Amino acid sequence: MIKQYLLVTKPGIIFGNLISVVGGFLLAAKGIIDYPLFLATLVGVSLVVASGCVFNNYIDRDIDKKMERTKNRVLVKGLIAPSVTLIYATVLGIAGFVLLYIAANPLAMWLAVMGFVVYVGVYSLYMKRHSVYGTLIGSLSGAAPPVIGYCAVTNAFDAGALILLAIFSLWQMPHSYAIAIFRFKDYQAAGIPVLPVVKGVSVAKNHITLYILAFMIATLMLALVGYAGYKYLIVAAVVSIWWLGMALRGYKTENDSIWARKLFVFSIVAITSLSVMMSIDFSVSSASPALLTYVW
């Protein structure tokens, strides 16, 4: 039974988000790490993300059974009662928000709240099922964790936080479209209006290319503005150019599914590489006026 409660939180998604939280936190910490704050931020974000994933599993249980990838999820198979799932998700969320508020700062908590509301309230409940722009809206919630990690340290939403938001939001788009392409039949069967299904794979390829170009600019800005060092800059340039090259090869591919799967896999390599590099190659001299400083 414990295993089912763990699976419904989508551990893989939690782990992926924690990598970005670490990147944002250590970028802001600049080598001076407050370990209790670091641990509290990781646990707090984990709880909030877990809560969002459980709510998402509850909301999507009707369409999950139509998709090959999700037909064996816990709620689809009835291994946990829906009513219990709601209580579980609520407890996880409250615990996460309270921990971020007490151990980090109110700004970190409110960023988590905004990411949660966008993911559960806007994306999962409505946009995912009714709009081709659902992925775009959902990308904002996916970009929240590194910003929370960053602001847990700075207690200010400055240019660095804004660039992180841009990097991770832009990354989500080609990453998600790639999934929709190699899982095309799943999304089509479930009636989910993702871009490749609604507009076609050719249009999705154009969007993927443009988003990767924008992603490249955003990643380089983190170093050019002075938040990260030249080693980060080199890695950011290499992974962005390589990812762009993979996207361009999609115009000549004979198998869209295989190409999209490779693009998806490399997207994980790319964002992980950037998270690691911003963690270890930060710039101690960067300073930027806060766009929003939360004083409590």
Swiss-Prot record:
Disulfide bonds: none annotated. It is an enzyme of class 2 (transferase). GO terms for biological process: heme O biosynthetic process. One of its GO terms (cellular component) is plasma membrane. Its EC number is 2.5.1.141. The keyword Transmembrane helix applies. GO terms for molecular function: protoheme IX farnesyltransferase activity. Pfam families: UbiA. The chain crosses the membrane at residues 13-33, 35-55, 84-104, 107-127, 132-152, 162-182, 208-228, 229-249, 264-284. Keywords: Cell inner membrane, Cell membrane, Heme biosynthesis, Membrane, Transferase, Transmembrane, Transmembrane helix. It catalyses: heme b + (2E,6E)-farnesyl diphosphate + H2O = Fe(II)-heme o + diphosphate. It is a multi-pass membrane protein. Pathway: Porphyrin-containing compound metabolism; heme O biosynthesis; heme O from protoheme: step 1/1. It is found in: Cell inner membrane. Converts heme B (protoheme IX) to heme O by substitution of the vinyl group on carbon 2 of heme B porphyrin ring with a hydroxyethyl farnesyl side group. Carbon 2 of the heme B porphyrin ring is defined according to the Fischer nomenclature. Belongs to the UbiA prenyltransferase family. Protoheme IX farnesyltransferase subfamily. This is Protoheme IX farnesyltransferase. It comes from Edwardsiella ictaluri (strain 93-146).
